[in-house]
Amino acid sequence: MDRSLRAHGGALVANGRLARVRRIVGVIGFHFASLDIREHAGRHHEALGELFDPLDVAYKVMNPEQRLGHLIQELNSRRPLAPPHGQNEHDNLTLFRTLRSIMDREGDHVIGAYIVSMTRGVDDILAPVLLAREVGLVDIGQGIARLDFVPLFETIDDLRAIGPTLRTLFDGQAYRQLLALRGNCQEVMVGYSDSN
């Protein structure tokens, strides 16, 4: 931020308010604030499609019901999907690796919620859970669940389907166990992006 401000004529702000914030953070850290992460549901499916390609799993062409069945199967499995760190990996998997690194260094409290925008169905919620499992942020069998996954419902149809979607989500054993590890509390966000 400092470099960007200076490069674009904002040296006054960089030397003033930003410098003051940097000094405070340098002394006490970000321990009083957490960061919510928001990512579009489609990005998770893209990343998983790339992970499944070498395994000859046609994830990219599956419909939501097929994806859901496959995601449940993978969450109940212990097999790793991701290649060793850094080998042609999708930037969404890199995001989860970065979150893990930050949480390992600073503590789990620095990341608040992982928000899944444009959630349409249960598969959209389980996809980032599986990606988080790949980097060790979730391991239900070992009792590890370091993130809260928050669906964000935004279209009229999705808003109308919240009840059945959440019932299906909570009926699933893997997600139910994850939820128990997180204190049996599920945050849900409601937005509205269909207005024109």
Predicted features and spans:
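Extended, charge-enriched "interface" segments that sit outside catalytic cores
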Residues: 1-105
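Conserved alpha/beta-domain cores
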Residues: 3, 25, 34-36, 74-196
